[in-house]
């Protein structure tokens, strides 16, 4: 689903769907839901395109971001890819990051803070 949307947005923007961009789209479709680091995305792409530079990868990710297809967030000093661009929570527990959507709670946070919320990162630890 994300792949089709990405290809459609690129077409609407008049951008070429090069083999490298297609591979990047496929990688994000495959691993984007687990909020990969930029390094993890790069490592997947260079398996098929070993000559692609990190700079080229990042430039294309910025294009995708400009098209509203993804965003970035930083966690523990590493930039991660966020494919869910709707307001939500990233629930972070140990090594796992899960999306959690609660529109009512987001609305309450927005009312209390007087801000529009894009994403809230929540770090969880067990009580025991």
From Swiss-Prot:
Alphabetical UniProt keywords: DNA-binding
One Gene Ontology MF term: transcription cis-regulatory region binding
Pfam family of the protein (one): FUR
Any one Gene Ontology BP term: negative regulation of DNA-templated transcription
Cited InterPro entries: FUR, WH-like_DNA-bd_sf, WH_DNA-bd_sf
Domain of life: Archaea
Gene3D superfamilies: Winged helix-like DNA-binding domain superfamily/Winged helix DNA-binding domain (1.10.10.10)
Family: Belongs to the Fur family.
Protein name as catalogued: Ferric uptake regulation protein homolog
Record organism: Archaeoglobus fulgidus (strain ATCC 49558 / DSM 4304 / JCM 9628 / NBRC 100126 / VC-16)
